[in-house]
Amino acid sequence: MIVPLLHILILAGILFVLGLVCTMVWRMNIIMMLIGIEIMLNAAMLAFVGAANRWGTADGQVFSLMIMAMTSAEVSLALALVVYLHRWRKTVNADDFNSMKG
């Protein structure tokens, strides 16, 4: 059974809005912002794979693999930065890091 493209795009849209809400509502917590960004990127991957399945090409799968590689690098760098900031300021609240003092 093949899932219609409309259902895939609706699910991708719901996931994207959920990630956007997660990013906007919990703007103070850096980890929750990262989770929201990851949910939005996963929604984009789902839309690419669904569209590629609809038109019978492999471009969506290739692009989703590139997004996976990019997000793994992004998560590793961002979590290393969060650990460093937590050791430095003892918090992961984004509002505490708005000063540019040295």
Swiss-Prot record:
Enzyme category, top tier: translocase
Cellular compartment(s): Cell inner membrane
Transmembrane segments annotated in the record for this chain: 1-21, 30-50, 65-85
Primary location recorded for the protein, binned into one broad class: membrane
Catalyzed reactions per annotation: a quinone + NADH + 5 H(+)(in) = a quinol + NAD(+) + 4 H(+)(out)
Keywords for this protein: Cell inner membrane, Cell membrane, Membrane, NAD, Quinone, Translocase, Transmembrane, Transmembrane helix, Transport, Ubiquinone
Pfam families: Oxidored_q2
Cellular component GO terms held in the UniProt record: NADH dehydrogenase complex; plasma membrane
Biological processes, Gene Ontology terms: ATP synthesis coupled electron transport
Cleaved signal peptide residues: none
InterPro entries membership: NADH_UbQ_OxRdtase_chain4L/K, NUOK/Mnh_C1-like
E.C. no: 7.1.1.-
Sample GO molecular function, one term: quinone binding
Coiled-coil region: none
Top-level taxon: Bacteria
Topology relative to the membrane: Multi-pass membrane protein
Gene3D superfamilies (UniProt xref): 1.10.287.3510
Function: NDH-1 shuttles electrons from NADH, via FMN and iron-sulfur (Fe-S) centers, to quinones in the respiratory chain. The immediate electron acceptor for the enzyme in this species is believed to be ubiquinone. Couples the redox reaction to proton translocation (for every two electrons transferred, four hydrogen ions are translocated across the cytoplasmic membrane), and thus conserves the redox energy in a proton gradient.
Family: Belongs to the complex I subunit 4L family.
Quaternary structure (record): NDH-1 is composed of 14 different subunits. Subunits NuoA, H, J, K, L, M, N constitute the membrane sector of the complex.
Annotated protein name in UniProt: NADH-quinone oxidoreductase subunit K 2
Organism field: Geotalea daltonii (strain DSM 22248 / JCM 15807 / FRC-32)
